[in-house]
């Protein structure tokens, strides 16, 4: 089973990490917030963004290299305002086997050109770096606290490669 790296431990990233940990996946969360890192490491809970939910077995780091070195699936649970900056940080360490999952809502800045979709901007940056990693988009009317509570919801999972999208959609 591939290790999942969740980049961004806001309420959405944390809720998904919780679900994946409960399903037995090996999850490593990445945050730039010292407060979140300390909370997850000391109490296995993100007291800032998703209080009241223990995340059994999730590791946490503040070093992005830890994620690229030890994870195969990189979940970008980041605000649209910073996701492309983080992708730029990831690119030098990406392996061809890394799968990127884009959870960002909103559009890419107009300076990115193209369709305005964040996933297209990610793919363009990868292509400019000579890389062809698969990018999966996961979106929908999902609410993090409900997902954390186990409420059933729907999400759209899309990728140019249907098999990859189906693999991600399985959980």
Each predicted region: which residue ranges?
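Short, well-ordered alpha-helix to beta-strand connector turns
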Residues: 24, 57-58, 71, 97
């Amino acid at each position: 089973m591939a290790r999942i790296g969740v980049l961004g431990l806001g309420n959405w990233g944390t809720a998904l990490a919780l679900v994946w940990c409960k399903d037995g996946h090996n999850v490593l969360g990445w945050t730039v917030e010292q407060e979140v890192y300390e909370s997850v490491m000391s109490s296995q809970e993100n007291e800032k963004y998703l209080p009241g939910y223990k995340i059994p077995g999730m590791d946490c780091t503040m070093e992005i290299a830890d994620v690229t070195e030890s994870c195969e699936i990189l979940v970008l649970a980041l605000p649209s305002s910073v996701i492309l900056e983080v992708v730029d940080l990831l690119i030098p360490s990406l392996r061809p086997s890394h799968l990127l999952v884009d959870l960002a809502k909103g559009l890419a800045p107009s300076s990115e050109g193209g369709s305005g979709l964040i996933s297209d901007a990610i793919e363009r940056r990868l292509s400019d770096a000579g890389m062809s990693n698969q990018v999966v988009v996961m979106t929908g009317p999902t609410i993090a606290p409900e997902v954390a509570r186990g409420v059933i919801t729907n999400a759209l999972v899309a990728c140019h490669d249907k098999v990859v999208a189906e693999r991600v959609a399985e959980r």
